[in-house]
Amino acid sequence: MFLTGFDAPTLNTLWVDKNLSEHTLIQAFSRTNRCFGETKKFGNIFSFRDIRENFDQALKMYADKRGLKDIKSNMVMREFEEVFEKFKDWTEKIKQKYPNPDEILNLEKEEKWDFSDLFGEFLGDYRTVKSYHEFDKDNPYLPSDEFNKYFAAFSQIQEEIRKEKAEKKALEVQEEDLSNEVRKEPQIFSWEYGEGIQANLDYIFHLIKDLYNCDNEQDRQKVLDKIKTAIRTNPEIQVNEDILNEFIEDLGKSFEKEKLEEVWKTEGKLRECLKDFCKKKEESNKKKIINDFLVKGVFLVEWVADKQLNTAKKKGEYSPSWSDTEKLIWKEKSTNLPTMTEKDEDGNFKWRKLITDISEAFKNHFERFIRFVEIR
């Protein structure tokens, strides 16, 4: 039987065109319902046959009475009307407490955390309701433009929480509460909740095209606000917001309006323009990294860096081994290399920190100037 031994946790959807029953049905359905970390909480079954009766019968055969109730309530999707009512309740609660999404980032820290917790819980149900074909993303309760504004604020607050928690962990500092009240810790939600709701580069390119077709400053500002919101819905793109802003400005300077119209014909041409722009920035940033370490007395070999970055481009990620990073250093030309056993004031090995710093510098370089332009 094909299903025997077939196990792929990443499998998302199973299309069924057979009258499955009993253990075969359970075995088939379980293949796509395997959870996969934070990226996959459930699978989807699309059946071209009416096998509801077979499904109910199979559950009765292989689940105890208590488990059967849990399976039916948690495994089988509810009717759209029921799910959509819950979605409407969520939007009412969010809008009542936070009527203006543009003002959320101006709130006090704990108020922002409260919003982050509320919206993060809502995203789980949002992901569910948007999986139904009946769901209209431009519904009157929370249309996509408004949702993106809330999600942009949520994304930024989540990033602030991550940084604060990382700093506390690094410093091993426990924050004292002077009021003697126990303050609720903010939650960190998985970015995958935003899967399918984050803006991609093609959408941003579409907005950039609109930008240069604006006839007045007021319309131009509206499009710029849309671009800003779109960027902030996707953490991968948000970290490169400065590059995109420079790119938009550079386009206006580099092309006359007639030539711009040729560029606008396809988003593919815009992506090529961004690649060219990032290539120039990449070269200057790479030289800056090398120069920054040279100032510290560490000589890095440029052609080795190029080779490792090209390998990373083919793999889609920058993940050199420890020895690969060490190969970047030309020891004979370096004037201030620590020994393998030398430690700093905190007792950390200086050589280990140097290798980590070099690796992090080139990893950040790769993410910003090479991998970034491939984001879809």
From Swiss-Prot:
GO terms for molecular function: type I site-specific deoxyribonuclease activity. Keywords: Restriction system. The keyword Lipid metabolism does not apply. It holds the Pfam family EcoR124_C. Gene3D superfamilies: 1.20.58.910, P-loop containing nucleotide triphosphate hydrolases. PANTHER family: TYPE I RESTRICTION ENZYME ENDONUCLEASE SUBUNIT, TYPE I SITE-SPECIFIC DEOXYRIBONUCLEASE PROTEIN SUBUNIT M AND R. The N-terminal section of a putative type I restriction enzyme that if reconstituted might recognize 5'-GAN(7)TAY-3' and cleave a random distance away. Subunit R is required for both nuclease and ATPase activities, but not for modification. This is Putative type I restriction enzyme MpnIIP endonuclease subunit N-terminal part. The lineage of its organism: Bacteria, Bacillati, Mycoplasmatota, Mycoplasmoidales, Mycoplasmoidaceae.
